[in-house]
């Protein structure tokens, strides 16, 4: 792990996690989770580990402030056919947010617990991973006998398909100054 080399590493962020209302998200977290499970079934997987923070916040309809100028939460998610395991700095999750997530079948765990939890996966597990987004330590902690299915994260693909409700969030008023700046920088007229 990086801590073995990076000895003066700053503490992990504990910025609050907040939920995103379905009117902005376009779809409930329950529906998104079911869509991911459907994609898992199609791929022949029964476990899906997500490491990409932007996909995690999209899937769970949450946001955070752990990385400057990026509304993500330092976290991992492990989706099974029964539960969703959310690995996060638990101090950053209020009781209200925890209750909302638990209602959707999401179980919270300490951020670092994922490394031990993947070691405990059953030998007959079929784990879907996106190799470009999975860290080496997490991958090396997988039991030897599990089947790994390297595939693009279905949440990333689903996230790219904007729903009608999401388009409404892009229809924000543009000020005269913003139009002028855009006109100057692009040479295009914005109406």
Residue positions per predicted region:
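Active-site neighborhoods and metal-handling regions in enzymes and metal-associated proteins
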Residues: 1-191
């Amino acid at each position: 792990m990086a801590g073995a080399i990076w000895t003066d590493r700053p503490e992990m962020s504990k910025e609050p996690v907040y939920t995103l209302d379905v009117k902005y998200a376009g779809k409930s977290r329950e529906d998104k989770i079911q869509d991911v499970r459907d994609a898992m079934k199609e791929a022949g997987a029964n476990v899906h580990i997500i490491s990409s923070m932007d996909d995690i916040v999209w899937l769970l309809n949450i946001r955070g402030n752990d990385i400057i100028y990026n509304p993500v939460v330092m976290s991992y998610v492990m989706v099974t056919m029964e539960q969703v395991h959310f690995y996060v700095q638990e101090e950053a999750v209020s009781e209200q947010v925890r209750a909302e997530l638990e209602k959707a079948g999401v179980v919270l765990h300490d951020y670092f617990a994922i490394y031990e939890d993947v070691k405990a996966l059953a030998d007959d597990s079929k784990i879907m991973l996106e190799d470009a987004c999975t860290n080496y330590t997490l991958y090396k902690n997988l039991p030897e006998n599990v089947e790994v299915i390297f595939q693009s994260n279905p949440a990333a693909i689903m996230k790219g398909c904007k729903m009608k409700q999401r388009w409404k969030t892009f229809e924000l008023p543009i000020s005269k100054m913003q139009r002028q700046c855009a006109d100057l920088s692009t040479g295009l007229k914005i109406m």
